[in-house]
């Protein structure tokens, strides 16, 4: 453990300090140094870790891959996740807390990105995962090579129809969604159509993409519990209107890169828990703030 309670990845030792001018230039890009020092398998992975706030330089988080770093700097990488990205740890909490089984199921990952959610699903027993992302080239190499994973990149989830994703194959009956720069309210109708009953889904609700700009503070962080609740409530109501039942709500064990508290919302056609009203959601948001800040 580091002095601030962080756990660090070990490759022979827990910290790395290279100060030999014959080996390194006076300064190098941080993403290059991570790869050179064998802290990452690729420069692309290094960039993802840096942007996610997982890399410390001289005990300070640096989140820009192109930052020029002195050759003598101490570079630390927080302990590697059991998944290809730490997003998997977020989903793992929901699966455990809500006692959701995905064993043998065909799943949809809306917003696959690196593939943390997909990796979590596979490690939890999923038979197949269809991953969709508007981007390209982000999915971890191990998942690209996994025959259980079908990847559809450069695709906007909002406009995707079942035939274009599954062809003649059966639809997924369990989904996970983690999207950015768009409200979940806009993609939920497509998610409903892309799943077959019982249409179970776990949504990662990111308040900064659900509220108006006036509610978003510095660095894109939604701090007020009232605003966080105001982000969750419309997503839940939209889901209920589409035909989903409420299963549960919890907060993510990890904050977003800028420090946003994120929430995990479980829905399903067979879920029959009473849906929380705004006050109950607000209470959850306040509890999350207290838990994370303690």
Predicted segment positions?
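Short beta-strand element of Class I
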Residues: 127-130
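Short, glycine-/aromatic-enriched active-site segment of Class I SAM-dependent methyltransferases
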Residues: 207-224
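Class I SAM-dependent methyltransferase "Motif I" SAM/SAH-binding loop
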Residues: 111-113, 134
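Flexible, glycine-/basic-rich loop-and-beta segments that form/coincide
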Residues: 261, 265-294
């Amino acid at each position: 453990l580091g002095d601030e309670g962080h756990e660090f990845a070990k490759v022979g030792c827990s910290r790395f300090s290279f100060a030999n001018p014959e080996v390194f230039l006076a300064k190098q890009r941080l993403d290059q140094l991570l790869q050179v020092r064998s802290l990452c398998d690729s420069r692309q992975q290094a960039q993802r870790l840096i942007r996610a706030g997982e890399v410390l330089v001289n005990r300070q988080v640096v989140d820009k891959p192109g930052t020029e770093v002195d050759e003598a700097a101490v570079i630390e990488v927080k302990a590697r996740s059991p998944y290809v990205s730490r997003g998997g740890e977020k989903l793992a909490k929901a699966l455990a807390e809500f006692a959701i089984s995905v064993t043998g199921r065909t799943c949809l990952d809306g917003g696959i990105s690196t593939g943390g959610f997909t990796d979590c699903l596979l490690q939890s027993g999923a038979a197949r995962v269809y991953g969709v992302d508007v981007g390209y080239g982000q999915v971890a190499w191990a998942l690209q090579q996994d025959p259980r994973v079908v990847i559809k990149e450069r695709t906007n989830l909002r406009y995707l129809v079942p035939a274009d994703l599954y062809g003649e194959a059966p639809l997924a009956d369990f989904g996970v969604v983690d999207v950015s720069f768009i409200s979940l309210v806009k993609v939920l109708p497509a998610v409903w159509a892309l799943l077959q009953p019982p249409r179970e889904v776990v949504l990662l609700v990111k308040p900064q993409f659900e509220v108006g700009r006036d509610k978003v503070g510095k660095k894109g962080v939604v701090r007020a519990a009232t605003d966080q609740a105001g982000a969750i409530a419309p997503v839940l109501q939209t889901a209920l209107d589409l035909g989903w039942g409420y299963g549960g709500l919890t907060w993510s064990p990890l904050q977003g890169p800028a420090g946003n508290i994120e929430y995990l919302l479980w829905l399903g056609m067979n879920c029959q828990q009473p849906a929380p009203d705004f006050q109950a959601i607000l209470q959850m948001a306040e509890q999350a703030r207290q838990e994370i800040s303690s």
